[in-house]
């Protein structure tokens, strides 16, 4: 079983049919964690004993009355900014290394209600922004496809753990691309749902008006299954959207014939330079969508530079507002990269913020108008394959616009999925974006693409090793 990598959908069917137990599945994942973690650094806290106990309880409940959801008995983990009752929540920072919340975040509560089994807390960039740092209490996560390379972030540990098969799915957060960038670089699926669809209550904030929480898993279908458990209004999150929870799984296998896809070609051809592997991935995706009956054409939006200038002013100003009090008294306890980011926010003025908010409204209006003529936007998930950890400075988000930022500015639902393998066999990805609250269509298009490729059949070499005994 050591080289068996079930998706959530596959494992859910096997658990429901009692062909495998949650306990066996959880043991498999925990044994991989034990084997890989000294090198991968995907986890900050592993809850082995409580996970096995929860898996046993799941098996008893499923034997008695069947699974209460497809997530029942499925091993997952949480980015270490999701508050967990009685379990430290560190934000990968010295400042919170001993912080133990007294209640669970809403996402944790909803996953528990669905029956998911938590294996622990995963590595992140400090406070979901600091970047990969070596001056923190825990080392940064590494990319399981090549341990000398960067997994991106800030949901780095969750992405690395999913790709390595340590968990079947996990929770991330996304303020400027922190779910989608690591999904692209680690070769998995990551969903930033519509702003307000998934509660952020109990998630340590970075930028209130741009923060999203969402699922990361091996496939678009798995993200849909997780979203089904997560979505819904929450009075504890002031930005929570009071909209009906749809069935995100029921139509995922339906045809995409007639779906109108707009390729934002300037995002990856003129606004920035992407690598040949990234370019090939998006061109191959276009051909697949056409073959499946979609109607594809190019569209134009404001440049990536405009989206990023607006987004970073808002993000950094709001991040400083979150950290101001602590920064003034304990600035030396932040890692260098996070300290520098907060300092930038400190020097932005109220006028800067107001101008960015005004421009944000204009940009949102422009995107809404563009999407009256198309159903889905197609762009790249990241501009390049994963860099070496020693060259991670080249990944500095201030050097080159992020392809992910436009959809944090607008809050539109966006899915990153693997679109192939580029330089030295490292994953590349595409992004698909839908109109607000059209996640069923978005996930259906992503699933249709994945069914036409063999990318989901590959796993990193670390995950093929035989020393993770099941």
Residue ranges with predicted function:
Residues 10-14, 28, 257, 269, ...:
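Serine-dependent amide/ester hydrolase catalytic core
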Residues 71-213, 264-266, 316, 320, ...:
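Short glycine/serine-rich loop/turn segments
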Residues 41, 237-245, 259-260, 265-267, ...:
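Flexible, acidic loop-helix segments that line cofactor/substrate-binding pockets
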Residues 71-91, 250-265, 314-368, 416-427:
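Short helix-loop capping/hinge segments that flank enzyme active sites or metal/cofactor-binding pockets
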Residues 9, 35, 113, 164-265, ...:
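Structural helix-boundary/capping segments
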Residues 1-52, 274, 291-293, 346, ...:
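An N-terminal boundary/leader segment
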Residues 9-10, 17-99:
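N-terminal, positively charged, Ser/Thr/Ala/Gly-biased leader segments
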Residues 29, 51, 73, 79, ...:
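Conserved hydrophobic/aromatic pocket- or pore-lining residues that grip, position, or stack substrates
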């Amino acid at each position: 079983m050591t080289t068996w990598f079930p998706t959530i959908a596959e494992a859910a069917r096997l658990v429901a049919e009692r062909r495998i137990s949650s306990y066996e599945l959880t043991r498999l994942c925990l044994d991989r964690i034990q084997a890989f973690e000294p090198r991968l650094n995907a986890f900050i806290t592993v809850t082995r004993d409580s996970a096995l106990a929860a898996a046993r309880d799941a098996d008893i409940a499923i034997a008695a009355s069947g699974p209460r959801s497809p997530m029942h008995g499925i091993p997952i983990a949480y980015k270490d900014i999701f508050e967990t009752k009685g379990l430290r929540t560190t934000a990968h920072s010295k400042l919170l290394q001993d912080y133990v919340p007294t209640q669970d975040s809403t996402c944790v509560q909803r996953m528990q209600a669905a029956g998911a089994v938590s294996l622990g807390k995963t590595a992140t960039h400090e406070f979901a922004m600091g970047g990969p740092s070596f001056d923190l209490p825990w080392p940064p996560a590494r990319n399981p496809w090549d341990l000398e390379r960067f997994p991106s972030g800030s949901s780095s540990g969750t992405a690395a753990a999913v790709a390595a098969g340590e968990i079947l799915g996990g929770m991330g957060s996304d303020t400027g691309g922190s779910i989608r960038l690591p999904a692209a670089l680690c070769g998995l699926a990551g969903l930033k749902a519509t702003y307000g669809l998934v509660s952020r209550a109990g998630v340590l904030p970075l930028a209130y008006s741009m923060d999203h929480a969402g699922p990361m898993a091996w496939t678009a279908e798995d993200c849909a299954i997780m979203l089904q458990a997560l979505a819904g209004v929450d009075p504890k999150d002031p930005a929570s959207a009071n909209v009906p929870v749809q069935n995100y799984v029921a139509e995922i296998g339906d045809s995409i014939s007639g779906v109108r896809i707009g390729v934002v070609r300037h995002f990856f051809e003129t606004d920035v330079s992407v690598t040949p592997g990234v370019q090939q991935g998006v061109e191959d995706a276009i051909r697949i969508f056409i073959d499946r009956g979609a109607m594809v054409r190019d569209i134009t939006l404001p440049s990536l530079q405009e989206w990023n200038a607006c987004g970073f002013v808002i993000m950094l100003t709001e991040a400083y507002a979150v950290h101001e009090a602590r920064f003034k008294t304990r600035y030396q306890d932040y890692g260098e990269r996070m300290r520098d980011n907060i300092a930038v926010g400190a020097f932005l003025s109220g006028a800067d913020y107001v101008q960015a908010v005004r421009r944000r409204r204009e940009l949102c209006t422009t995107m809404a108008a563009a999407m009256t003529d198309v159903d889905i936007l197609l762009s790249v998930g990241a501009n390049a394959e994963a860099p070496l950890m020693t060259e991670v400075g080249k990944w500095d988000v201030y050097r080159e616009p992020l392809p992910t930022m436009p959809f944090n500015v607008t809050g539109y639902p966006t899915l990153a999925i693997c679109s192939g393998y580029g330089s030295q066999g490292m994953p590349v990805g595409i992004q698909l974006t839908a109109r607000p609250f059209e996640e069923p269509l978005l996930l259906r298009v992503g699933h249709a693409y994945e069914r036409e490729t063999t990318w989901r059949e590959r796993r990193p070499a670390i995950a093929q090793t035989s020393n993770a005994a099941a």
